[in-house]
Structures are given as C-alpha cells and as structure tokens.
C-alpha cells in the first residue's frame, strides 16, 4: 500500500468518517514522501494518533496564552485575529521521528499545535474527540506559520 498510486496520487489525501456528529471524527491520512502537513491545531480537542506505516518527522508546540490555548474568545474576535494574522506565543514541546506503529496523544493544551513531514510514503489514523465544529471557533482548525524570535520586527 505504501507505493499504491491510488492513495498517493496527491501529496496529502484523507478518508474521513465523521457521521455528521460532534462526538468524534475518524480520519485516515495518506502523506506522500517529502510532503509537509502544515502547522495546525485541534482546539479544545484530544486526538489519538497511530502511524499505520511509513516514517514522519513530528514537531509540536504548546500555546502559552490561556486565551489562545482554549480559543477563549467570541466569534468576532476570532475573525479579527485571523484577518490581522495576529502572532501568538507558543513553546516547542516535542520533536521526534515517528515510525510504523508509533502512537501519540494530543491533549487540548499539550502538543496541540503540530506538523508532520513525511520521510517516506506514510499513512496515519486520527481519532478526534470531539469532532471539529466549523461554525464555532472553539473547535475550528487553524493553520499557523512558525516565526522565530530573531525574525520578528517590531
């Protein structure tokens, strides 16, 4: 399956089973060698991760400010934060190489921002508890760009 062109026709493919409910989301990801899954979060969610096959580099961060850690703001404020591309402070919590059968547990405030880079064609399975809620910012995925302290201009 690791070289099956059906599963790796794009850089990042996924199969999602969410049954239109807010309780959970099951996702199978296929990530092609050399592809980076961008830095993202799972706000107010826990995620159980298992690498089915392949090899991934993994980096995770913890948000520092309690307000951002739990998306503790109203919808208008959330949209303003996104449109202004407000910087948030996060500290690196983990960096590791993952191999077949490795598991991770992402909690709402620990390792919640993370990214993967595929060292070879890989497949992993996520169980997200609860499911994302696109209409409510408290459980809506957000993508980030890492900026090092020495790159920040006032």
Model-derived features with residue positions:
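Short acidic-glycine-tyrosine-enriched beta hairpin
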Residues: 21-23, 46-55, 60-118
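A short glycine-rich, His/Asp/Glu-containing loop-to-beta-strand
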Residues: 2-33
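A short hydrophobic beta-strand segment most commonly corresponding to one strand
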Residues: 48, 120-134
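Phosphate-recognition beta-domain surfaces
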Residues: 89-91, 124, 136-139
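Short acidic (Asp/Glu) patches
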Residues: 10-12, 29-45, 110
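Extended recognition/assembly regions associated with phosphoester-bond processing machinery
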Residues: 16, 23, 98-111, 134-154
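Short histidine-centered beta-strand/loop micro-motifs
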Residues: 17-18, 29, 38-42, 50, ...
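Short coil/turn segments at secondary-structure boundaries
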Residues: 42-44, 61-64, 129, 138-140
């Amino acid at each position: 399956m690791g070289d099956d062109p059906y599963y790796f026709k794009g850089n990042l493919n996924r199969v999602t089973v969410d049954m239109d409910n807010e309780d959970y989301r099951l996702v199978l990801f296929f990530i092609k060698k050399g592809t980076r899954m961008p830095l993202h979060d799972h706000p107010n969610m826990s995620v159980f991760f298992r690498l089915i096959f392949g090899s991934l580099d993994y980096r995770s961060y913890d948000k520092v400010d309690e307000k951002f850690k739990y998306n503790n703001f109203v919808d208008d404020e959330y949209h303003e934060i996104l449109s202004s591309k407000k910087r948030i402070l996060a500290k690196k919590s983990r960096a590791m190489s993952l191999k077949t059968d490795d598991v991770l547990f992402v909690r709402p405030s620990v390792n919640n921002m993370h990214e993967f880079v595929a060292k070879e064609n890989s497949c992993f399975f996520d169980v997200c508890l609860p499911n994302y809620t696109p209409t409510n910012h408290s459980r809506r995925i957000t993508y980030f760009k890492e900026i090092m302290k020495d790159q920040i201009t006032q």
